[in-house]
Amino acid sequence: MVDMDRISISLPTNLLAEFDEIIEERGYASRSEAIRDSIRDYLIKHKWIHSLEGDRAGTISIIYDHHSTDVMEKLTNIQHDYEKLIVATIHMHLDHDHCMEVVLVKGDASDIKELTDKLTSQKGVKQVKLTVMVPGGNIPQ
């Protein structure tokens, strides 16, 4: 038997309600098993992102609450710190409270990962998705 630790987390009511619907829909035996599965998926994604090497091009998509204290200023300052990596940005208003920013990047994978981590860790950021590709000349034939 695997050793288990018991933890406690706080979640917004609507997030937990939506998670519980998925748990029921997918037929999980318990909320704990669904959370373990979600953590496994997160760990796999993290390992994949951090195994990337070499020259890459891609997008970093960010959804954030623009009412959150200084989030827009912080995201802009971080982007200015990586101006050699960032090719372009696109900003879109999703609704009254949320914006989406798509950052086009090209450069070393380690720098792209570092930028992604800094953007992800900001208060007010709801979701970040990194998509990377091998630049055209490096695509296997």
UniProtKB/Swiss-Prot annotation:
GO BP field: response to nickel cation
Keywords: DNA-binding, Metal-binding, Nickel, Transcription, Transcription regulation
InterPro entries: Acetolactate_synth/TF_NikR_C (IPR027271), ACT-like_dom_sf (IPR045865), Arc_rbn_hlx_hlx (IPR013321), CopG (IPR002145), CopG/NikR_regulator (IPR050192), Ni_resp_reg_NikR (IPR022988), Ribbon_hlx_hlx (IPR010985), TF_NikR_Ni-bd_C (IPR014864)
Transmembrane segments: none
Pfam families, sorted: NikR_C, RHH_1
Disulfide bond entries: none
UniProt-annotated binding residues for Ni(2+): 80, 91, 93, 99
Record's function text: Transcriptional regulator.
NCBIfam families the record matches: PRK00630.1, PRK01002.1, PRK02967.1, PRK04460.1
UniProt similarity note: Belongs to the transcriptional regulatory CopG/NikR family.
Protein name (record): Putative nickel-responsive regulator
The species this protein was found in: Methanococcus maripaludis (strain C6 / ATCC BAA-1332)
